[in-house]
Amino acid sequence: AKIVGRKIGQTSRAMQELVGIKEPDFGIILNNKVYAEGVPIKADSMMFPRIEVEIGFYLKEDLQGPGVTVLDVLAATAGVFPLLEVKDSRVKDPHNTTVVDSIADNATSGVVILGGKLTPLSSDIDLRLVGMNFEHDGRVIDSGTGVEVMGNPAEPVAWLANKLAEFGMKLSKGEFVMSGGITKAINVTAGSSFKATFD
């Protein structure tokens, strides 16, 4: 398997306080965990599946910290796209996890469903104001805007580039970065369908 993306988790202050951390966590995305929109996913292939909506950043340039800013992220981004993450947890009690559990569990990474439209960034797109409705079996169950992801979805991407620099690593051209959940994670059961609509 090949690394094709990176994920950032625990981007909200509430989630950080819940697991006793002061910053997000992060993990990798492998190519065999990525699906196109509309492709069914077997619920029984996962242990504790939960789904959430995120904004993805597709990089056209490397991002090497330290000192990466939101503006650097925007300049290095070919475009943004909607995605759904089906998180999974392989720890004994997924309702009571610590940051150590999350790190060992690849930031509760499961599978990723990529939206089919890449939107180039332009001066009239403010990621903080991008709105989203989240549907479960045809009924809207949640909504949100980009500002709910650390104030700006590009902020956690900058954070990750700077964090990786501490380990001599970088975000690479051609990878995508998942910026963190706009919605709370919803439990998934077999037979369910989910849809996210952005405006």
Region locations from a protein language model:
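A conserved acidic, glycine/proline-rich C-terminal tail/linker
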Residues: 157-189
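Catalytic-core "active-site belt" of small-molecule-metabolizing enzymes
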Residues: 1-150, 193, 199
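Alpha-helical scaffold segments in soluble metabolic enzymes
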Residues: 58, 79, 113, 155, ...
